[in-house]
Curated annotation (Swiss-Prot):
The keyword Phosphoprotein applies. The keyword Hydrolase does not apply. InterPro entries: GCIP-like, GCIP-like_N. Residues 196-222 are annotated as: Disordered. This is Uncharacterized protein C22E12.18. Residues 201-215 have a biased composition (Acidic residues). The modification Phosphoserine is found at residue 211. GO terms for cellular component: cytosol; nucleus. Pfam families: GCIP_N. Keywords: Phosphoprotein. It comes from Schizosaccharomyces pombe (strain 972 / ATCC 24843) (Fission yeast).
Length: 336
């Protein structure tokens, strides 16, 4: 072996050693995510606590980008080690952010979202370290084998952006975005139900078709709906319309920064349950499932609970009577 090869081999070994040191920090931090004690926010951030999230995510994004660029030929040991070590300095602030924004003080939405994004960031950093290393790195965990290896730098940077957005817009910004998704899914459910009522069975059982032509041929004939089925579909459409009005009203009147995070979290969870129950009930009617009545009861109950939260868990205002009236009408509609 020539002197040059020996020198290159030694340099690669030093790079691997340095990257393994950083990787150990990352893997250890990721294991801590599921069992962390809350800590207080640094005094200098009390006035704008969410800015901590934005600052941490921005730094991680910057350093991981620099490391990714440094790994392109010609690769130098100094550049790799410098940016890997710089990146390592962001791990502690990231974990601290998860500890600061705990569920007890800031609500489950921020805590759960932040933990999810932080885990993806850490997996992404691990993936980046492994990709730039000249030799395989250690610390291969079961989590890495099953989930981490599927994370790439694109997901890493997307997660950084999600944390930045959470830091910029807070829980309200996140909820408004998700709320639009709820309404969109509700619209899709209404559309599917209209198709069902008209006798169109396509679009919800085509995944196994060998070709588009096969699919069209299989569903070329409309399915006859009985009067009872049509009445049931119309009744459910009426309820979905009522739920859409409720969702839009909540978005306008209840998803505001003036409400505590605990209330907003309770509201979000109830909305998600209602949205999920809508998907379930429409799927049940399409498949003519015998469990339809149970799913229908669950749908009625989840929508009722969502409205009750708007009445009882928020400070009474001029719009509280509207929610009370909606609930009153829902009790009538849900009996049909």
């Amino acid at each position: 072996m020539s002197d040059t090869m020996v020198k290159n081999q030694a340099e690669e070994d030093e790079i691997v050693k340095s990257l393994n040191n950083v990787l150990k920090i990352v893997v250890t931090a990721r294991k801590c995510l599921d069992d962390m004690k809350p800590i207080e926010l640094p005094s200098e951030l009390v006035e704008s606590p969410l800015s901590m999230l934005k600052d941490v995510a921005t730094l991680i994004h910057q350093y991981t980008t620099k490391l990714s660029v440094a790994a392109k030929p010609p690769i130098t040991r100094d550049a790799l080690e410098k940016y890997a070590n710089d990146m390592a300095t962001t791990i502690t602030p990231l974990i601290a952010a998860v500890q600061v924004f705990n569920a007890e003080k800031y609500g489950e939405i921020i805590q759960n979202r932040l933990k999810m994004y932080a885990e993806r960031v850490l997996f992404g950093i691990e993936a980046l370290l492994r990709s730039v290393s000249p030799k395989p790195l250690g610390y291969i965990s079961e989590d890495w084998k099953t989930r981490g290896r599927l994370i790439d730098t694109g997901i890493l940077w997307e997660s950084c952006e999600k944390i930045e957005k959470l830091g910029s817009e807070g829980i309200v910004g996140y909820m408004l975005e998700e709320w639009d998704n709820f309404v969109s899914m509700l619209e899709d459910a209404r559309s599917d139900l209209e198709d069902y009522k008209e006798g169109d069975d396509s679009n919800w059982d085509d995944f196994g078709s060998e070709s588009e032509d096969d699919s069209k041929e299989a569903h070329s004939e409309e399915v006859f709906r009985s009067e009872e089925q049509i009445q049931l579909a119309n009744s459910l459409l009426q309820k979905l319309n009522a739920c859409k009005i409720l969702f839009l009203s909540i978005k306008k009147r209840r998803i505001k920064n003036e409400y505590p995070n605990t209330f907003l979290g309770e509201l979000f969870n109830a909305a998600k349950q209602t949205s999920d129950s809508i998907d379930d009930i429409v799927a049940q009617i399409q498949e003519d499932d015998e469990n339809f009545e149970n799913e229908l009861d669950n749908f009625h109950r989840s929508a009722r609970n969502l409205c009750k939260i708007c009445i009882s868990s928020a400070q009474e205002d001029s719009f509280t009577p509207w929610f009370s009236k909606w609930l009153e009408n829902w009790e009538i509609v849900s009996q049909k």
